[in-house]
Amino acid sequence: KRQDPTAIGSEPILSTDSMSHWRRCMQGHSASNLVPVVAANRVGEERVEPCAENAGQSSSLVFYGSSFITDGCGEIQISMGRQEEGFIAATFDLDQLMEDRLSWGLFRDRRPEMYGKLL
């Protein structure tokens, strides 16, 4: 059975390294919603063997790891290296996070009842 990659890895343009862009995007999601984010990524290489589904082509993907956890403002609290396997954890004061969300007013003008279906 074919399994597609489920993490960020090799680039379509070989001279590009999107790791820092990926981190900044995730930090932005955290900051814009005032919630901590746990961003997990694989490490190592995954080889794609020739099969009918890929027209007999082989390739490989190199995953750049670099998993991290942000606080509610998007600041990285703890991170891992590109080849580092393991676990990381962080503790947050949930009451303080809720207070921060309420005091910033980021959600005040959102109107979810007006959102249409995506699909």
Q: Language-model segments: what does each one mean?
A:
Residues A52, A89, D109-R111:
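A generic membrane alpha-helix/interface feature
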Residues E84-L102:
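A short, polar/charged loop-to-alpha-helix boundary motif
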Residues R42, L97-L119:
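Cysteine/selenocysteine-centered motifs that mediate thiol-based redox chemistry or coordinate metal-sulfur cofactors
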Residues K1-F87:
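CN hydrolase (nitrilase-like) catalytic-core segments centered on the catalytic cysteine
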